[in-house]
Design a protein with these regions (language model features):
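Active-site-proximal inter-transmembrane loops
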Residues: 161-169, 232-255, 261-262
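Alpha-helical transmembrane anchor segments
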Residues: 207-245, 249-250
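Non-catalytic, topology-defining segments of multipass membrane proteins
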Residues: 1-220, 225, 265-334
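Conserved active-site loop/cleft motifs that coordinate metal ions or position small ligands
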Residues: 257-259, 294-295
Length: 334
């Protein structure tokens, strides 16, 4: 029986699960994570109250800048640069993105990327860390509160991370992550307002939790809402969707249907909506000064052909293509 068992394991290892998949499983709650999330959210609500009643304007502006900077570090850095290699970055930009990503407190880049590459390779299956087949709560935040599914662990070992494991910037972050995240995400955001404009430590700390919680939910929303509500202009057979409103609050990450079809595109969206796609503008700026280069994108012809073949008949704004054609003729009559 031994040879059969080994052969079965090899076959099992190389078999890609078919989505949607959510086999019955036991959930083992990680209570330490639950308690951290409870504290963060209660503290953030208190911080929001302080922001409206007691905090200095400098503290509010300071935390807003941290929120925006951390958001760009996740969308441009963890996601488009390191997860999908959609563009390349010179050392100064890599260091900047790594430090700001640490400030967002969303795992080290290497852990973030492994989970995200798993998500793309095994989307909506038991090997997907945030499997949307298990419901919107699970894909949003619940997956972080329980131990990983055995398939996530098993398939995670097969994900190729060789392009990042020898990156000195990411190796440094991984090695010193507990120290760095404590300093960047908690100590500095609390102490800087106290030292520079005499904010109270209580207010500075709790207001800083607001940007931490809101920034986390910004990322979580792509894993959950962008797999539940919206249009599917590129591929109607998959769960990822496109949402203009979600793009507004996620710096351009809401064009998720497009992204799952063309994950290599640094824009994560078609041309024509870049003024909503702040991350694309962020990358374009650093390309202009020479810190970002080799920006990859799908050609308009490639996008049009795929949309015609598998799309749901909507355009990049979520409108029916027939309606879009009528509007175009009104603006540009032949």
């Amino acid at each position: 029986m031994a040879p059969y068992s080994e052969e079965y394991e090899i076959l099992k290892e190389n078999t890609k699960p078919v989505s949607p998949q959510a086999a019955p499983r036991e959930y083992t709650v990680v209570y330490s994570v639950v308690l951290i999330f409870v504290y963060w959210h209660i503290g953030a609500l208190y911080g929001l109250y302080l922001g409206f009643t007691s905090a200095k304007w400098a503290t509010i502006i300071f935390n807003y800048l941290i929120y925006v900077s951390g958001g760009f570090a996740i969308t441009a850095g963890s996601h488009r640069l390191w997860s999908h290699r959609a563009f390349k970055a010179k050392l100064p930009l890599q260091i900047l993105l790594m430090l700001l990503q640490t400030m967002s407190c969303q795992k080290s880049v290497l852990n973030w990327v492994r989970d995200h590459r798993l998500h793309h390779m095994y989307c909506d299956t038991d090997a997907d860390p945030y499997n949307s087949t298990r419901g919107i709560f699970y894909s949003h935040i619940g997956w972080l509160m329980v131990k990983k599914h055995p398939e996530v662990i098993r398939k995670g070992r097969t994900i190729d991370m060789s392009d990042l494991e020898n990156n000195p910037v990411l190796k440094f972050q991984k090695k010193f992550y507990p120290i760095l995240v404590t300093l960047m995400a908690f100590i500095l955001p609390a102490l800087i307002p106290v030292i520079f404009w005499q904010e109270s430590l209580n207010i500075a700390h709790h207001v800083s939790l607001v940007h931490l919680v809101v920034g986390s939910h910004m990322t979580f929303a792509i894993n959950s809402i962008a797999h539940a509500f919206g249009s599917k202009p590129c591929d109607k057979t998959i769960s990822p969707t496109q949402s203009i409103s979600l793009s507004l609050v996620t710096f351009g990450e809401g064009y998720h249907n497009y992204h799952h079809v063309f994950p290599f595109d640094y824009r994560v969206a078609e041309l024509g909506n870049n003024y909503l796609n702040l991350t694309t503008n962020f990358i374009d700026f650093f390309a202009w000064i020479g810190w970002a280069y080799d920006l990859k994108y799908a050609s308009p012809d490639m996008v049009a052909k795929r949309a015609k073949r598998t799309g749901d008949g909507t355009d990049l704004w979520g409108r029916a293509i027939e309606h879009a054609d009528i509007q175009a003729k009104r603006v540009h009559p032949s």
